[in-house]
From Swiss-Prot:
Places the protein is found: Endosome membrane; Lysosome
Keyword tags: Coiled coil, Endosome, Lysosome, Membrane
Classification of source organism: Eukaryota, Amoebozoa, Evosea, Eumycetozoa, Dictyostelia
GO biological process: establishment of protein localization to plasma membrane; phagocytosis, recognition; phagosome maturation; regulation of DNA-templated transcription; response to bacterium
Membrane topology, record value: Peripheral membrane protein
Record organism: Dictyostelium discoideum (Social amoeba)
Coiled-coil residues: 482-539
Family to which this protein belongs: Belongs to the vacuolin family.
Gene: vacA
Domain of life: Eukaryota
Main location: membrane
Name under which the protein is recorded: Vacuolin-A
GO cellular component: early phagosome; endosome membrane; late endosome; membrane; pathogen-containing vacuole; phagocytic vesicle; phagolysosome; vacuole
CDD domains, A to Z: SPFH_like
Gene3D superfamilies in alphabetical order: Band 7 domain
Length: 598
């Protein structure tokens, strides 16, 4: 089959030559007999899907290419003419249509472009020219006599056959010259985004994120992980295994499944806090949680997966559910206490029923499974726990058991040498379980019941009395706490008030001290100023003695300011020569000197 190919053609104009110069593709038909398995190279979509080499051309260009490729080898012997004889013109067709005819079953396309046309009239009886009819230029498929045009819609593939082998065409127009070409227009197109495209021996798988696919190729199983590019297989022995009754959207398994088995392949994902149990040719193999976060893949028909076992802390109540069911099966008339409790006899011959709480962790899974088996670990822990607890109860009186049961395992007591029954049993049981790869974390009597009715009533009465005493004691303690709290609050309030008063007194004293200090500093400054003034005045009087005399006269004048002078006639002459007569002048001169100093 050849797309757009042909035998020798007559000379054409430059436009026709440029059209033919486009790449010519021969359909890639692959054998299903494992020819593609040479080497490790995988097939890709580009190897099996035939691309259109003129899908991106303009509509006019595409029409011309289709005409030239479809009509290769016809040359001047066209079956159509645009100059019809009178009365031979055919019905006009829209410009969006080709018309198709044939000359002796050699198909031909013609584009009348809305003009009149007709078939060629020939007198040769050996030439048979027929008009087939109009075909839309955008029709998905048309053709006749080994010539075909295929217009694949966007986002689709076209499934066809050539030489009885499947072929796939990509979106866009294709011209196929092939007498063995087969195409079913009703079922031939498929969406490119389908998760699984199957076309005879061609298989395309698109595995969504979070999914895996289980497939067979011949007798070999494969588990395919999700990836961006699709998987492509051309093999008649390819088979996709999907869950029973699965629809197209459910063809795949979840990639988060902890265990997926497909033929001899086992895909295991142990979670944190557990390990996988496998047997490789009968030899126990423990698979821990992978550090790289990837699934563990085992491809061996003799390496079998048994299950998972927890390595994190587990807490169990004994008797277990299975033990209770077995007790009921053994004795249909058994009482509820005989089923729900494990019954022991004390040293003073009293029957008590207990429920144990055991917390443990498997630290060596290989050792534990080797010695006990996967299903026997819990049973062994239950049996040895009851065996050790029963031995301890048989060696103790009811009073001792009740006393020790009121103290939790590991709780501090006044006597360090005293151990509870749980502690004694735990230490012995821990050593026993360690030999089997199990670490005991806790052992405690969860429930204890005296089965003797009369003794149980007496114990109940004692419990009531003890409860009343405990309640009264708790009330007294509470009242004491309240009184203590009130006294403490009052003392704290008084202390706060006293502190506030002390702070006020201290603040007032500090204020008075500061005021006195400032007043003393002021007096010192004043005295110092007066001292300096006196020193300056003394220096002035020393330098200018006349000023001292003037000052002395001023002092005398001040002393005589309010005095009354009585002058006798005989003293009048002496008074006129006295300095007192010039007192006013002296005072004025003194004032002038003082102003200059200032």
């Amino acid at each position: 089959m050849i797309e757009g190919s042909g035998s020798k053609t007559p000379k054409r104009n430059s436009d026709e030559i440029s059209v033919k110069s486009l790449s010519i593709h021969e359909a890639n038909t692959l054998s299903s007999e494992h020819e593609h398995e040479s080497g490790n190279e995988e097939l890709t979509l580009s190897q099996i899907v035939i691309r259109s080499d003129f899908a991106n051309e303009s509509s006019e260009r595409q029409s011309k290419i289709i005409l030239d490729r479809f009509n290769q080898g016809i040359g001047k012997n066209s079956a159509f003419t645009d100059s019809p004889a009178l009365g031979r013109g055919l019905s006009r067709v829209d410009v969006s249509y080709f018309v198709m005819g044939h000359r002796n079953q050699v198909a031909e396309l013609y584009d009348p472009r809305g003009q009149r046309f007709s078939t060629v009239l020939t007198p040769d009886p050996t030439v048979n020219i027929k008009y087939v009819g109009p075909v839309s230029k955008t029709a998905h498929y048309f053709g006749a006599y080994g010539k075909h045009v295929l217009n694949v819609p966007a986002g689709h593939y076209a499934k066809a056959f050539s030489k009885n082998r499947p072929v796939l065409y990509g979106e866009g127009p294709h011209v196929i010259i092939d007498p063995t070409f087969q195409f079913d227009e009703n079922n031939g197109f498929v969406n490119q985004q389908e998760p699984f495209i199957e076309h005879s021996t061609i298989n395309i798988l698109r595995i969504p994120a979070g999914k895996i696919a289980k497939v067979w190729i011949g007798t070999q199983p494969h588990i395919l992980e999700s990836r961006r590019d699709p998987y492509v297989f051309v093999d008649a022995q390819f088979k996709l295994v999907s869950p029973d009754g699965a629809k197209k959207a459910q063809l795949f398994e979840s990639s988060s499944c902890t265990f997926v088995e497909h033929g001899s392949i086992k895909r295991i994902i142990p979670h944190t806090g557990e390990v996988a149990i496998t047997y490789n040719n009968g030899i126990l193999t423990i698979i821990p949680t992978p550090k790289d976060g990837k699934p563990v893949i085992i491809d061996s028909p003799t390496h079998n997966f048994e299950g998972f076992i927890s390595t994190s802390l587990q807490t169990c109540l004994f008797p277990s559910k299975e033990t209770k069911q077995q007790a009921l099966a053994d004795n249909k008339s058994a009482l509820a206490d005989e089923i729900n409790l494990k019954i022991f006899q004390t040293r003073d011959s009293l029957r008590v029923g207990v429920v144990l709480v055991v917390a443990f962790k498997i630290v060596d899974p290989e050792l534990a499974i080797t010695k006990l088996g996967k299903e026997g670990i819990i049973n062994h822990i239950e049996n040895v726990s009851f065996a050790d607890m029963g031995k301890a109860i048989q060696l103790s009186t009811l009073q001792e058991i009740m006393y020790f049961n009121s103290i939790k395992p590991g709780q501090a007591t006044n006597d360090d040498s005293v151990q509870t029954i749980q502690d004694r049993v735990k230490s012995h049981l821990a050593r026993d379980l360690f030999d089997y790869g199990v670490e005991l974390s806790r052992l405690q009597i969860e429930t204890m019941k005296v089965l003797d009715t009369e003794i149980a009533k007496k114990l109940a009465g004692q419990s009531v009395t003890s409860a009343e005493f405990t309640t009264k004691q708790a009330t007294l303690v509470k009242e004491y706490d309240i009184k203590t709290t009130e006294a403490r609050l009052k003392a704290e309030t008084d202390n706060i008030a006293l502190e506030q008063r002390n702070k006020a007194i201290i603040s007032e004293s500090q204020a008075k001290l500061s005021s006195a200090q400032r007043e003393a500093e002021s007096l010192l400054i004043t005295a110092e100023a007066q001292k300096k003034a006196s020193e300056l005045q003394g220096e002035l009087y020393t330098k200018y003695p006349i000023l001292a005399e003037i000052e002395l006269a001023r002092i005398k004048a001040e002393a005589l300011k309010n005095a009354t002078l009585y002058i006798t006639p005989q003293d009048a002459g002496a008074f006129m020569n006295s300095p007192l007569v010039y007192f006013d002048k002296m005072m004025n001169a003194n004032n002038t000197i003082q102003q200059k100093k200032n």
